[in-house]
């Protein structure tokens, strides 16, 4: 009679919530990995953010009317490929990454901050870690797959218990059976394998699963005998099969869905037997009941989604709203939201239905790793989901001990924007969350002691740990100056300068722009003479060869260095009144490079010192007074993308097409002082010193052509970047324009129109996003003007020039009312006098060092806001409601009557009719 069995889930319906119940305004990543990208415990949700190596963390349940906030945890230096919560500890998270390591994290409980470092690190492996999963019965055991290798780890000892036999190709899935005795794997060689890792490393069984080698996944049912696999057939159709390990030669049942290229993720609840099939890039969920006894995959219901699915996860059964007959809850990850989709059986919602909610495995492990490896097969004790039987025993793993909570009076805040909260009845109801808005540290490297341009003493760091770090420039806005300041009608602009060049250069007096004409002509435009340029030909500098880069001397605003394809550097002197005629003879010509020149950079402190890089793979340091190269740096294996002087002028950093970042001490020797891994992409890169010379910022591309920013500790390049920030996929190179002691803007280059703004910190969270903005048209280049050009009275933070477009000025919004009357010394610290040299070329070459002078930007008639008297808070009179609440009903009644009597009173004033004038007696007739 089993074939006529009526399923108790036959009327199950999926209930997508209203948009108010979505976890909205998140930034999910679109990683190439075929994993789920989102996981949930009974307290937390974690997902892949749009930044490689960074996870978003949010409570499963909102607290009251407050908006839930997303915290960001920097886990790895590369993409997080897979993640999993411990089945026993809601706050123990394992992450695997393309950086070839597995890390275990203790996520924050009440009053705790995000971890600054992982509790356990496993690996590194030979290839990126693709799969990982915790053991279902023992705490501290997990399985991971990297390439063709599958390992079973004892996390406490940080050593593998065993390494399974190598597979024939990339392992796509590795999962534990429900009893924890077996491991099932799916491989790109189209084979399914069953392992008993405690018996032998070889597979005990294997069979061909799906005819297509595309992504294949496994999910075990509630018993060790049966599991489900998903994959593709020869027609590239999604395929689902039910297997019995006792009859492994063929599938018990199978079904075919639609044609798609996205991975089909099986979300199987072993207690109910409900299977949700979620296809990446699709807008539909399929729900089936797995019935091994028939055997069959019985359809239950389908759910149409409002947004494209990027990932999916099941919420643990202990977090379901059992009194509402919620038998399953799926979390859909889209680009900008997490949507909870509950599956409900239409029954009375005031009773607990034991047939729908059988006892499930509890959160106390049945055994330890040593006992399990010795053969112990005890199962976790089951617990009832009936609310009347709660609470259940809890467990905290000793793998990563919890930290001490902060005092109850101080709750830490989150680093990101609030996300839309969910109604308690709309699918996110769960036990109270333990995430209390942590700050955002990162484990990508050692933390430093202070920030870039903003003092972070102990008091400020303590405040940030309580309130969450946020940039004071987060409300900055980009504003186009009035058209009267524009320089327009510029014709013949050269749009084909090499990728190593910024395209144009500027100082406080003039702009130099290469033109698309023969002879390497350079136009020099006076900033003090804005307006429309004449239609006639402009006076130019005749360089004689195509321009590859150009730079103004920071200590001589009339001297311009121009590099050409003929491997020569020409120094031009522009008359003080401006360029009025064509100049054909440069002041000096520097020769020495063997091939065309890539970049030019003047020394920040010493006069007449210039660095140049060339396609001959060398960097030369020139003495402009003598007109010769005095130093030559070597060690590059490919094209040099960019170079930059350190703020103290003692070191020079380069980023190269060979994927390496190098730091030199030019006066010490020609070989690099240290090297480290750089961007993997070979399309272009930039490098700049930040955070007072303690860090290096590199912009470039990863292997997937995604543009990214990498932050390095300058003294530890070999350890890799402290943090990696992924932005978007675009062909143009990001050109970082850094404002010392403030914050950088990283504008897109050549054909882009967006400008990204970040404040940089040498410690976690490293990148603090500000208010990015988009220009109305694409720009060719982007240059910062000296700080002295800013209007500090109007709180103008930076002034920039855009090539082929009007000048730009950056203004903050949301300034205090005193911003226009007091000098904002917290926003405008003393700036370096970058237009006056500290050393001569000869002194620097002989080993002398110096520091720039500092200049206050405070106008003489303005007082600093830090010294402005603070207004005392106005006393608020108690409200009438509060006043009345303190009195009894009888007192209120008496006071009301007295007030009425006092208002009316016993007045003896004449009545209105007494003032009327009557008529004479004879008028009555």
UniProtKB/Swiss-Prot annotation:
Q: Where do the segments described as Disordered lie?
A: 196-216, 399-465, 857-925
Major place of localization? Golgi
The regions listed as transmembrane in this protein's record are: none
Q: Which SMART domains match?
A: DUF1899 (SM01166), DUF1900 (SM01167), WD40 (SM00320)
> How is it modified post-translationally?
The membrane-associated form is phosphorylated on tyrosine residues. Ubiquitinated via 'Lys-33'-linked ubiquitin chains by the BCR(KLHL20) E3 ubiquitin ligase complex: 'Lys-33'-linked ubiquitination promotes interaction with EPS15 and facilitates actin polymerization at the trans-Golgi network, thereby facilitating post-Golgi trafficking. Deubiquitinated by ZRANB1/TRABID.
Domain of life, per the record? Eukaryota
Q: Give the UniProt entry's GO cellular component terms.
A: cytoplasmic vesicle; cytosol; Golgi membrane; trans-Golgi network
Q: Could you tell me where this protein is found in the cell?
A: Golgi apparatus membrane; Golgi apparatus, trans-Golgi network; Cytoplasmic vesicle; Cytoplasm, Cytosol
Q: Which UniProt keywords apply?
A: Actin-binding, Cytoplasm, Cytoplasmic vesicle, Golgi apparatus, Isopeptide bond, Membrane, Phosphoprotein, Protein transport, Repeat, Transport, Ubl conjugation, WD repeat
Give this protein's Gene Ontology molecular function annotations.
actin binding
The UniProt entry, under InterPro entries, shows:
Coronin (IPR015505), DUF1899 (IPR015048), G-protein_beta_WD-40_rep (IPR020472), WD40/YVTN_repeat-like_dom_sf (IPR015943), WD40_repeat_CS (IPR019775), WD40_repeat_dom_sf (IPR036322), WD40_rpt (IPR001680)
**Residues modified as Phosphoserine:** 462, 465, 915
- Purpose of the protein: F-actin regulator involved in anterograde Golgi to endosome transport: upon ubiquitination via 'Lys-33'-linked ubiquitin chains by the BCR(KLHL20) E3 ubiquitin ligase complex, interacts with EPS15 and localizes to the trans-Golgi network, where it promotes actin polymerization, thereby facilitating post-Golgi trafficking. May play a role in the maintenance of the Golgi apparatus morphology.
What protein is this chain from? Coronin-7
Q: Which gene encodes it?
A: CORO7
